[in-house]
Structure formats: C-alpha cells, structure tokens
C-alpha cells in the first residue's frame, strides 16, 4: 500500500515539474516568439558548474594517475566485475566526458597506489574479496 502511494506521489511530482518547466514559445508580445529570455543568474550558474566539473575532472585524473592499474584490474576480476581501467595516459578528457556532473573521485585506497620504489604496495599480496573499494566517487 505504501509503495503504491509513494509511486503515485513520485509520478505527481514528475508531472508537476514537467508542466512547471515547460517553455512558453510562440506567445504574444515582443520577444516572446523567439523563446525564453536568457537570465544572467542562470548563465553564471552554468559557467560555474562547467568550471567546477572541469576542476573536479582534473583532480580525479590526478588521483587516478597515481594508481596501480594492474592491482585495480586484478581486484576487479576478483570481484567478478572487470574494471575498464587502462593506462592510456592523461585522464582529464576521459573523466571530463565520462563522469556525471560534479561527481569526483574522493580517495584511492592505499593498497592500489603506486609505490615510489618501483612496484605496487600489494604486488605480492592476494587481494581479498572483502577489501575496500579501489575508487570511491562522491
């Protein structure tokens, strides 16, 4: 009963949002026939969002460039979910296009970080399936 009520409320909210956000094209009066007026606040928000997304993508790429790709992929295969992580070089364009807006990599587990001495920290250790996730996104 409560699941049906929740579904009805969700549908009502979606319909209300769709009706409220409908643009008013073709109205009478000067300027209304060419669409909505662009507001300065919306333009500033869009620019700030784009800059935030670009900065987040660069920070995420820098964190993931320090990861040991072989350990990450081995962990993915142990979990039954192979990771599509390949060392293709700088990841800024990849993550700028692939990540959802304002979704950044928060941390990389120390097990998967590159060692300054050549190998990875967990190179000879077998990663257990109850290990922490390699990459956490917020």
Curated annotation (Swiss-Prot):
It comes from the Eukaryota. This is Chorion protein S16. One of its GO terms (cellular component) is extracellular region. It is found in: Secreted. It holds the Pfam family Chorion_S16. Belongs to the chorion protein S16 family. One of its GO terms (biological process) is chorion-containing eggshell formation. The gene is Cp16. GO terms for molecular function: structural constituent of egg chorion. It comes from Drosophila melanogaster. Residues 1-20 form the signal peptide. Chorion membrane (egg shell) protein; plays a role in protecting the egg from the environment.
